[in-house]
């Protein structure tokens, strides 16, 4: 009896086909061998670089919002819209991105998004080119919005591909880890932007340096994606679910998702988490400003927020790959995130408590970001056989919609904050606001969403069950042949 399932890495011949030692997959499915390829790590690396650069471009102005507003002679609200435009554009584009990923495949999604990302980053640099901005004009902000809009179109493609990548290229015991690595490269970009922007923009004129710095990795990602990704899937699938990869038609899949009770609960609660964390990432500098914390400290807190998020996501990803306890991990992280959000809403009201604020930001990232990769895998598990692009994409679209609502709501709940002297974070003290009420509402939303998910979310792991049944059928066929 030939061995049917192989998890070892295989080499490839010059024609790009796998070198198999046993039977090749037959059309009737009764003989199949699963293979993994070293090339999957290159594809993962390109997606990570692309996702990281896209996030850097998104959040690049938020850590230096006050300096940006002064340089381009606009209000803080306009600077906030540079981040908000990502969420607004991602909603209509998200449905097209889900269709493209599930219909045309990973290759086209990655290459197309990399070109949008690169062109958008270059257009942003037009804001500081003297020839394009005559003296006395305020056209620079329009170049920023145009570039941000192109990068925003790329974002859904970038955010929706990790689950598809994990399913198509990685075996079942590596899927959650691959999803974690690809997913967390996006907050890595946020982390780097929180460090780079305040470090570079110590003076208004250094805005030009910042724009140039963020363009370089976007160009590199485009070159690697265009030249290096040659196929939308490996020649031989890595798992049973990848072998049986035919998913529901796009419209039928969306309809099936919206009638799946477990998925709808996950979509709304997971989306709420995305929306809240998007708002915190965009406003962190302004949230800490009203108690006298500097831009640099806000950048450090943002970096800690993401760094500990990596740790949480990494640990949870490895744990879930080995135990398959998706529900338990996500519910635990939701509960701990809710408790930490309450602590965050309280500690930001104290002055000169840098250690305490930094610790709470670290814990918020540790528990909050751990939900993302495991939550995406859980979305696929509870909605199988709907395509991965659709199941994760709809959850992210929910997050973008809620992100817009929360960003507008939190800004409306702020109050002008009177200062007795210049703030260490703001050049224009009339535009410093008290965010304490907004953060209390944020904590309430986190707590409510966590309770809903913990109490009402229940599901079977449909993809894992399908793989178990498939492998069991193969073993039965092989036994009869022997």
Swiss-Prot record:
UniProt keywords, alphabetically: Membrane, Transmembrane, Transmembrane helix, Transport
Membrane topology: Multi-pass membrane protein
Positions of transmembrane segments: 41-61, 81-101, 109-129, 150-170, 181-201, 206-226, 264-284, 296-316, 330-350, 355-375, 390-410, 437-457
CDD domains tied to this protein: MFS_MFSD7
Cell compartments where the protein resides: Membrane
Pfam families: MFS_1 (PF07690)
Cellular component GO terms held in the UniProt record: membrane
GO MF entry, a single one: transmembrane transporter activity
Highest rank taxon of the organism: Eukaryota
Family, similarity comment: Belongs to the major facilitator superfamily.
Protein name from the UniProt record: Solute carrier family 49 member A3
Species for this entry: Xenopus tropicalis (Western clawed frog)
Phylogenetic placement of the source organism: Eukaryota, Metazoa, Chordata, Craniata, Vertebrata
């Amino acid at each position: 009896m030939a061995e049917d399932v192989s998890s070892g890495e295989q080499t490839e011949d010059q024609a790009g086909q796998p070198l198999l030692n046993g039977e090749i997959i037959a059309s009737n499915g009764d003989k199949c061998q699963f293979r993994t390829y070293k090339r999957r790590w290159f594809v993962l690396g390109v997606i990570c670089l692309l996702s990281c650069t896209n996030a850097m471009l998104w959040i690049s102005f938020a850590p230096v919002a006050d300096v940006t507003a002064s340089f381009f002679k606009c209000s803080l609200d306009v600077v906030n819209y540079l981040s908000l435009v990502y969420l607004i554009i991602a909603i209509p584009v998200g449905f097209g991105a889900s269709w493209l990923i599930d219909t045309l495949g990973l290759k086209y999604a990655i290459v197309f998004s990399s070109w949008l990302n690169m062109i958008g980053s270059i257009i942003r640099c037009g804001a500081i080119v003297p020839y394009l901005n005559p003296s006395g004009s305020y056209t620079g902000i329009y170049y920023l919005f145009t570039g941000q809009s192109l990068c925003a179109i790329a974002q859904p493609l970038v955010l929706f591909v990790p689950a598809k990548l994990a399913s198509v290229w990685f075996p079942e015991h590596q899927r959650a880890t691959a999803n974690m690595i690809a997913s967390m490269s996006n907050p890595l970009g946020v982390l780097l932007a929180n460090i780079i922007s305040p470090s570079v923009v110590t003076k208004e004129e250094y805005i030009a340096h910042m724009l140039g710095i963020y363009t370089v990795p976007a160009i590199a990602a485009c070159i690697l994606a265009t030249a290096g990704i040659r196929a939308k899937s490996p020649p031989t699938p890595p798992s049973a679910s990848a072998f049986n990869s035919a998913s529901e038609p796009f419209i039928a899949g969306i309809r099936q998702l919206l009638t799946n009770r477990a998925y709808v609960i996950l979509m709304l609660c997971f989306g709420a988490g995305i929306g809240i964390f998007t708002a915190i990432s965009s406003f962190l500098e302004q949230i800490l400003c009203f108690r006298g914390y500097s831009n640099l400290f806000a950048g450090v807190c943002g970096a800690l927020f993401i760094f500990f998020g990596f740790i949480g996501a990494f640990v949870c990803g490895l744990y879930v790959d080995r135990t398959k306890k998706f529900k338990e991990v996500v519910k635990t992280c939701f509960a701990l995130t809710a408790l930490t959000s309450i602590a965050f809403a309280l500690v930001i009201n104290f002055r000169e408590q840098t250690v305490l604020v930094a610790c709470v930001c670290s814990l918020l990232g540790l528990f909050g970001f751990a939900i993302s990769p495991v939550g995406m895998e859980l979305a696929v598990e509870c909605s199988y056989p709907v395509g991965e692009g659709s199941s994760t994409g709809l959850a992210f679209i929910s997050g973008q919609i809620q992100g817009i609502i929360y960003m507008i709501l939190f800004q409306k709940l702020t109050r002008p904050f009177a200062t007795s002297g210049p703030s260490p974070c703001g050049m224009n003290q009339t535009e410093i606001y008290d965010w304490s009420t907004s953060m209390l509402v944020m904590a309430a939303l986190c707590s409510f969403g966590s309770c809903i998910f913990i109490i009402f979310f229940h599901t079977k792991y449909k993809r894992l069950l399908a793989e178990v049944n498939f492998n069991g059928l193969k073993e039965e066929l092989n036994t009869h042949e022997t």
